[in-house]
Amino acid sequence: MSRFFRGGDDSSTDSSSEEEEVYTSEEEEEKVQAEDESSSEEESDEEESDEESSSDEEEGTKKKGASRFLQSDDESEEEEEEQSDDEATTKVKSAKDKRFDELESTISQIQNGQKINDWSLIANEFDKLNRQVVKLQDGSKAPKSYIKAIADLEDFMNETLAKQKVTPKKMNATNARGLNAVKQRIRKNNKEYQTQIDAYRKDADAFMESDDEVAAPKVVSKVRFEAPVVSAEQQEEDDKGFSTVDSRGKVVQYTPESILKHLRAIIESRGKKNTDRLEQIKVMETLNKVVPITPYQKIRVLQTLISARFDLGAGGAAQMPLDQWKAAERDLASLLEILEKEKDHVVVEGAEEWDDDDKLPTIPEGEKYLKVPGSVVSLIERLDDELTRSLQAIDPHTSEYIDRLTDEGSLYNTIFRGLLYYEHLRKDASLEVPQESLNRIIQRRLDHVYYKPAQVVKILEENAWKQVSAEADSEITPRSQSGDAGKLINILSNYLFENSEGIIRARAMLCQIYFLALHDEYYKSRDLMLTSHLQETIANFDIATQILYNRTLVQVGLCAFRKGLVYDAQNTLQEICGSGRQKELLAQGVMIQRYSQVTPEQERLEKQRQLPFHMHINLELLECVYLTCSMLLEIPLLAQTGSSPDVKKRIISKTYRRMLEYHERQIFTGPPENTRDHVMQASKALAAGEWKKATDFIHSIKIWDLMPNTEGIKTMLAKQIQEEGLRTYLFTYAPFYDTLAIATLSSMFELDSRKVSAVVSKMISHEELAAALDQVTETVIFRKGVELSRLQSLALTLSDKASSLIETNERTLEQKTQGSANAFSRKDNRGGGQRGGGQRGGRGGARTGGNPQRQAGGTQFTGGALGNAVRG
């Protein structure tokens, strides 16, 4: 039949053919605009198939044109029969259905790739999937099968990455490239569908069974309209005349009588699945504005509201949102303000819960207070912890970190008001407020001031006292003593030391020592550290306290260096700086160790323990101080070992020795570039007696500018280098002098004659120098024969090594022949193992006696001609 004589049913086929033509043109345009290079081959295949299909359609339309009127009657009848048979058996699919079939096929290919762990296949199919879903977003709706596929693929990718961290087996190169490609693309892609993905992960069955499709964001938006900024007051005015309804469509009314019921429902739903926390916060903010509201209701609403805000920072969230933190800080300040005004309402931990939501509680007979269950100190601690987490996550080199750090002032005011409130509660013994609560809040206050300079602490205290009324005062830290930071730290530390035990007591002591060392009170801080005996028990404390101990130890060492006590500074810093793990021990960074198996949980805990940047101790300055002290001690010691074998094995700093040996092995040494190079070249100059050159190298280190009183420190270092240069010179050249005038040494090292005499006298009294000081002629008279020559010292070295070789061989032989009765006997009964008497053949000399004792000093190589030469 001709198409001009068809009935009304043909309109559907015409519309479907028009859809196919539009689909073909849209496909061709999109394929021309495709940007992914990896899919060029696939697109070319699709274009070829589209061209073939379009050519078939054109041929069909031509046949349906003029040529079909030239057909015979028989042909037309046969064709009508074939068409009727095809219509009875063939199901015509629309273009949209075809696209859905292609989408499902691609998803199944991705699932097959997941089963065989073929990430190259997954990467290609994932790109193809994203191109296909663009064509299906006609009404800005993403198919649920697509949402399910990308969510499952992201979970599978995270599992694969986690397995790769803990398993030593690596992927091949192709698979690894595919995994990296998927990791880069899927995170960027899934951000556009995060709402649908979250809904799917909360309840997959409900998401897939729901009728309405979740709207997906448009991939390409040509025109963007920005929503006008609406203030809170304007939004409230716009909402007038409207009522809030619940999920069942009933109007929700917030009245003073229903506040406790709403709070009960919110508290019971906390922690449950699919709970909208932001909606709960909005409800409680509305309850907080209900008028009239009693103090009890206000306290209950604020407690629940603050806890709900903290829930936003719990779980997998990196940190609490900034606006919620500031809102929680304001709510906590409002809570403390209410408790300060309403003296008959108290928040204590041991109070009973009020169960009757239909009526308000009253003060029981015979009591003065209405007790509300809760803990103010726990809220303050959580607020403090959230600020620390936020500072850990912010880049410290940005202005955002400085802006966030300003919130510490308002937090300190809240801690101070909380301390005043707990002091008020402790006055009444009937409330039975535990001492531990007061200790915890004092410890938080101490944690915020112990590492700050006295001027900053003074400003914090002044601002805190301005926030409270003029009549308010503290028994622990009176208002009259708020101007002296040293007294404040001393009072807080002594209070905790007397009224607490365990970790809090140890932390209080360490905070006081840190503050004293920071303000150049070296001898006080050293005596407190020694009398506390914390170095003996610190291993039994938690990791946070051990970190504080390490920080305090470093600060004491830096204080000793500023005082010019080089030996004390080096000994104090040796434990931390000699390990090479300063970052880890001071909680200022995570050390990436080779071949270490660190679980994700351990890595997360390690990052949580890191200190915020403003609390860090400069590691470059610390290394510079340690290496400088080691140089001033090691260079004279190395010069002394050249002529005195008794001190040969004494090493003050192994770290410094390794650096010095590595520097000496360098064929060419360029100008110093960093702190370590400056110290190494200064060491080389000092060992050669060029103390002026060594001083110039040390003074040119720019890190000294970070220390207070920079010029005083440089002057102190110059004097130390002069004295140690004098000692090094005497150790090196003593064997070549008979007498040496004090005036000569004074002019060489530009030291006062009295200072030179004092240094020489100290060396003689410590038996470091075999000489005598003639005060009449002001000369140093050296004794000959005491110091060994170079040949004698080398001969002793050879004898020591030969002796140790013999002992090692004998021990090895005894271990190999252990248990054998006649291990050392020979056929002619001459054996080295028969030590009960007799002679040893062929080993030079005889040994008599049953079991002769070894000579002291370890140099007992006495056999053969070499032994006789050494003895002679």
Curated annotation (Swiss-Prot):
It holds the Pfam family PCI. Keywords: Cytoplasm, Initiation factor, Protein biosynthesis. It is found in: Cytoplasm. One of its GO terms (biological process) is formation of cytoplasmic translation initiation complex. It comes from the Eukaryota. Residues 1-100, 812-872 are annotated as: Disordered. Residues 16-59, 72-87 have a biased composition (Acidic residues). Gene3D superfamilies: Winged helix-like DNA-binding domain superfamily/Winged helix DNA-binding domain. InterPro entries: EIF3C (IPR027516), EIF3C_N_dom (IPR008905), PCI_dom (IPR000717), WH-like_DNA-bd_sf (IPR036388), WH_DNA-bd_sf (IPR036390). Residues 831-848 have a biased composition (Gly residues). Residues 613-787 form the PCI domain. Belongs to the eIF-3 subunit C family. Component of the eukaryotic translation initiation factor 3 (eIF-3) complex, which is involved in protein synthesis of a specialized repertoire of mRNAs and, together with other initiation factors, stimulates binding of mRNA and methionyl-tRNAi to the 40S ribosome. The eIF-3 complex specifically targets and initiates translation of a subset of mRNAs involved in cell proliferation. This is Eukaryotic translation initiation factor 3 subunit C. It comes from Neurospora crassa (strain ATCC 24698 / 74-OR23-1A / CBS 708.71 / DSM 1257 / FGSC 987).
